[in-house]
Swiss-Prot record:
Reaction catalysis annotation: GTP + AH2 + S-adenosyl-L-methionine = (8S)-3',8-cyclo-7,8-dihydroguanosine 5'-triphosphate + 5'-deoxyadenosine + L-methionine + A + H(+)
Residues binding S-adenosyl-L-methionine: 30, 72, 123, 194
Co-factor(s): [4Fe-4S] cluster
Molecular function terms, GO-annotated: 4 iron, 4 sulfur cluster binding; cyclic pyranopterin monophosphate synthase activity; GTP 3',8'-cyclase activity; GTP binding; metal ion binding; S-adenosyl-L-methionine binding
Residue numbers binding [4Fe-4S] cluster 2: 257, 260, 274
Note on cofactor: Binds 2 [4Fe-4S] clusters. Binds 1 [4Fe-4S] cluster coordinated with 3 cysteines and an exchangeable S-adenosyl-L-methionine and 1 [4Fe-4S] cluster coordinated with 3 cysteines and the GTP-derived substrate.
Function: Catalyzes the cyclization of GTP to (8S)-3',8-cyclo-7,8-dihydroguanosine 5'-triphosphate.
GO term, biological process aspect, one: Mo-molybdopterin cofactor biosynthetic process
Name assigned to this protein: GTP 3',8-cyclase
Gene name for this UniProt entry: moaA
Annotated [4Fe-4S] cluster 1 binding sites: 24, 28, 31
């Protein structure tokens, strides 16, 4: 039934964010401040390589061009390299990326690249080792920096770095970040702190609009770039004097959802139409046999009829997202 995934608002979906675990070994203040707590799913309960192969095959048939593997921390899965290779079996999928805390990047970047990974996003919320430790609960700053070096050495031409923008934590460190990306092709993406079910107090204390940074970048001569159809939601800025780029992800900005091009599947096989939506559509019963592909594609396409025009974060409605590891942030 191959046809491009399109919703009731004529938005086309080229991008799948696929969570492969909700386990994480970091304790970031904005995500899992008390550390990972199993939610009734054992490691054996997460999608298998065969199930991942089937779900990505179905999405590829429906026009998906990019798959991002998320968590939790994806690299904690021992079969992570096999998962990359399984996704890469689909010729229609042109980009396979991972969002990682960088814990195992120095060790494994070359193997991931060889398996077919084309993009790496690393979470780095501070360039100060002590503050990094305070935010993540792990004294791994130098290890993560070595991982970014290893990614470049492995042949990744660009590395994306995700930084959650927090008032009185890192929002005043723009000059430090800019100096870091000046000589290197790093796309540094500042992500507005988002309210989650478990993070309301933190949100009220530390949220700051990315508009503040955008105004400053424009004042300094940074130029807004056009988005490609399978790009994520970042507004990307470049500057002739910098090898790196700046991205801004501002989910509270008006019309943020108008260009939505991505869907999410959780680590237990639920399709989520929005990071902050309700419920979810189970796909797992249709991931057990190759012969189920038509039914799987139909269920995915039919589910899109229910996708809302916008999220409801402005009303502090975070849907089922209790924390950002739940369905892959």
């Amino acid at each position: 039934m191959a046809s491009q995934l399109t919703d009731a608002f004529a938005r086309k979906f080229y991008y799948l964010r696929l969570s492969i675990t909700d386990v994480c070994n970091f304790r970031c203040t904005y995500c899992l401040p008390d550390g990972y707590k199993p939610g009734g799913v054992t490691n054996n309960g997460f999608l298998t390589v065969d199930e991942i192969r089937r779900v990505t095959r179905a999405f590829a048939s429906l026009g998906t061009e990019k798959v991002r593997l998320t968590g939790g921390e994806p690299s904690l899965r021992r079969d992570f390299t096999d998962i990359i290779a399984a996704v890469g079996e689909n010729d229609a999928i042109r980009q396979i990326a991972v969002t990682t805390n960088g814990y195992r990047l120095a060790r494994d970047a070359a193997n991931w690249r060889e398996a077919g990974l084309t993009g790496v996003n690393v979470s780095v919320d501070s360039l100060d080792a002590r503050q990094f430790h305070a935010i993540t609960g792990q004294d791994k700053f130098r290890q993560v920096m070595a991982g970014i070096d290893a990614a470049f050495d492995a042949g990744f031409e660009k590395v994306k770095v995700n930084t959650v923008l927090m008032r009185d934590v890192n929002h005043h460190q723009l000059d430090t970040f800019l100096a870091w990306i000046q000589p290197r092709p790093i796309q540094l993406r500042f992500i507005e702190l988002m309210e989650t079910g478990e993070g309301s107090d933190l949100f009220r204390k530390h949220h700051i609009s990315g508009q503040v940074l955008r105004d400053e970048l424009i004042k300094r001569g940074w130029i807004h770039q056009l988005r490609q159809r399978s790009d994520g939601p970042a507004q990307v800025f470049c500057h002739p004097d910098y090898a790196g780029e700046i991205g801004l992800i501002m989910p509270y900005e008006k019309d943020f959802c108008a260009t939505c091009n991505r869907l999410r599947v959780s680590s237990v096989g639920k399709l989520h139409l929005c990071l902050f939506g309700d419920g979810g559509v189970s796909l797992r019963d249709l991931l057990q046999d190759d012969a189920q592909q038509y039914a799987l594609e139909k269920r995915i396409s039919d589910a899109l009829r229910e996708k809302k025009q916008t999220h409801f974060l402005h009303q502090s409605n975070t849907g089922i997202t209790q924390n950002l590891s739940y369905i892959g942030g």
